[in-house]
């Protein structure tokens, strides 16, 4: 993983040369991150950093999306502060994935809000103040419950290390209380209905890099927190509350998919589709099967490629040319923008889970695990595949089919920069769809280790009946 940070340092150095007067402290901070995976024994402050298969993949995805998010908006953003905020946000996410204790996880979980808040407040659309307030109030308030749960761990164990807390045997009542506190922050970050209302507003007003990183990486912190904070330690409570969470997930998938059919803003449509796909991830994560957990992580990776690509097209390429995001403004793009139309159709088919894409692998495994856990709710969740095909095909047919509307003027097709950006997102999605074992082998450590923890805790409870 040291090579990962070498690449990150090189990227920061390159950006400092391309962007005039880029602050050189960014290169220093990024270089210091190279040694962080080895600093696992800071006993004086109880902070631990390392990585495993799941963290490695999410960190690589973060590293992959950072330069794309900056280059996608290269022509519009001349401010040095804009690129510094994007790099700071990326560094916060990288450190968050390396944290091995709850305290440092919460610190960087909250610290990632600061650059995102500034990005939206300074470079967002007309209602950027409202969007910045939404993301701050929703996520900050919900995370306070997580902080209270972590404080209780500190009182009981005098330690918040993942390995130590995963071996702690708690009563069911205490587990349920901790589960409700932890899941409050995770449900807002995912987000699940009815706590999802902040995400469409934030996406519609956020700058392009903010939307790409929010959809591609920041939402993945919820799944990452679930597998780090809840499942190893609160396994009994997670089994107890799984039906309730499944009902929330199914309600989220149905509601967001149906309401997407009535939306006209292109960024809001993609934002609602992100909510639906993250609900599928939560279904697989709580399935208590290795199939579902693996599928949930694979779908997170797939969503990290496809959703930023769609945001790049509607919030970058089309908006730069027409300064409009209304769906009914566009029609017949395939007649004079064939390359952009082909790229959009490929990403749309991937987003609806078409076979031979990595999205199909993730959704199939997640729904398989959900059906094994709860057949009725899992079958209802499988209807989301049909609903996602409905709104995605409606959007694709409207933008690419027919003849152009009288409001549109003929513009140029994709530039070389935009073509390279699209290829860098489409090729991994299709390649991993043909060879999913490449990413599943990386991710195998996480569900396998989690399954071992669950078996071990079950054995302990059977051996000590009074616990």
UniProtKB/Swiss-Prot annotation:
Signal peptide: none annotated. GO terms for cellular component: mitochondrial membrane. GO terms for biological process: ATP synthesis coupled electron transport; electron transport coupled proton transport. Its EC number is 7.1.1.2. It is a multi-pass membrane protein. It is an enzyme of class 7 (translocase). Disulfide bonds: none annotated. InterPro entries: NADH_Q_OxRdtase_chainM/4, NADH_UbQ_OxRdtase, ND/Mrp_TM. It is found in: Mitochondrion membrane. Pfam families: Proton_antipo_M. It catalyses: a ubiquinone + NADH + 5 H(+)(in) = a ubiquinol + NAD(+) + 4 H(+)(out). The chain crosses the membrane at residues 21-40, 54-74, 79-99, 105-125, 135-155, 168-188, 207-227, 239-259, 266-286, 297-317, 330-350, 367-387, 420-440. One of its GO terms (molecular function) is NADH dehydrogenase (ubiquinone) activity. Keywords: Electron transport, Membrane, Mitochondrion, NAD, Respiratory chain, Translocase, Transmembrane, Transmembrane helix, Transport, Ubiquinone. Core subunit of the mitochondrial membrane respiratory chain NADH dehydrogenase (Complex I) that is believed to belong to the minimal assembly required for catalysis. Complex I functions in the transfer of electrons from NADH to the respiratory chain. The immediate electron acceptor for the enzyme is believed to be ubiquinone. Belongs to the complex I subunit 4 family. This is NADH-ubiquinone oxidoreductase chain 4. It comes from Debaryomyces hansenii (strain ATCC 36239 / CBS 767 / BCRC 21394 / JCM 1990 / NBRC 0083 / IGC 2968).
């Amino acid at each position: 993983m040291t090579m990962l940070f070498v690449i990150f340092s090189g990227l920061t150095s390159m950006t400092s040369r391309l962007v005039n007067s880029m602050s050189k402290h960014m290169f220093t901070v990024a270089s210091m991150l190279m040694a962080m995976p080895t600093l696992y024994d800071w006993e004086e402050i109880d902070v631990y950093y390392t990585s495993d298969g799941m963290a490695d993949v999410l960190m690589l995805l973060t590293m992959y999306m950072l330069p794309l998010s900056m280059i996608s908006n290269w022509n519009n953003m001349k401010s040095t502060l804009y690129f510094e905020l994007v790099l700071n946000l990326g560094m916060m996410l990288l450190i968050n994935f390396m944290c091995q204790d709850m305290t440092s996880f919460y610190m960087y979980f909250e610290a990632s809000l600061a650059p995102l808040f500034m990005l939206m407040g300074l470079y967002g659309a007309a209602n950027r103040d409202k969007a910045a307030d939404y993301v701050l109030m929703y996520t900050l308030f919900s995370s306070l419950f997580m902080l209270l749960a972590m404080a209780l761990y500190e009182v009981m164990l005098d330690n918040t290390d993942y390995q130590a807390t995963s071996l702690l045997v708690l009563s069911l009542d205490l587990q349920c209380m901790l589960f409700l506190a932890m899941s409050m922050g995770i449900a807002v970050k995912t987000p699940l209905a009815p706590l999802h209302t902040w995400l469409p507003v934030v996406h519609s007003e956020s700058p392009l890099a903010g939307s790409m990183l929010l959809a591609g990486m920041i939402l993945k912190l919820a799944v990452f927190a679930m597998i780090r904070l809840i499942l190893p330690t609160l396994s009994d409570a997670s089994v107890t509350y799984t039906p309730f969470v499944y009902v929330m997930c199914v309600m989220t998938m149905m509601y967001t998919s149906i309401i997407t059919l009535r939306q006209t803003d292109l960024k809001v449509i993609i934002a609602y589709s992100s909510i639906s796909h993250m609900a599928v991830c939560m279904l697989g994560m709580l399935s208590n099967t290795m199939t579902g957990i693996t599928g949930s992580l694979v779908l997170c990776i797939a969503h990290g490629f496809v959703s930023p690509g769609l945001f790049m097209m509607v919030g970058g390429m089309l908006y730069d040319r027409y300064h409009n995001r209304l769906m009914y403004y566009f029609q017949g793009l395939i007649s004079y923008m064939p390359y952009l139309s082909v790229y959009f159709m490929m990403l749309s088919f991937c987003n609806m889970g078409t076979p031979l894409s990595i999205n199909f692998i993730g959704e199939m495994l997640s729904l398989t695990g959900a059906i094994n856990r709860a057949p009725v709710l899992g079958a209802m969740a499988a209807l989301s595949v049909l609903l996602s095909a409905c709104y995605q095909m409606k959007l694709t047919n409207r933008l690419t089919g027919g003849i152009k509307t009288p409001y549109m003027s003929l513009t140029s097709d994709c530039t070389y920069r935009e073509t390279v950006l699209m290829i860098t997102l489409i090729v991994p999605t299709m390649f991993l769809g043909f060879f999913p074992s490449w990413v599943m082998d990386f991710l195998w450590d996480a569900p396998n280790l989690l399954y071992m923890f669950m078996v071990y805790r079950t054995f302990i409870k059977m051996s000590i009946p009074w616990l």
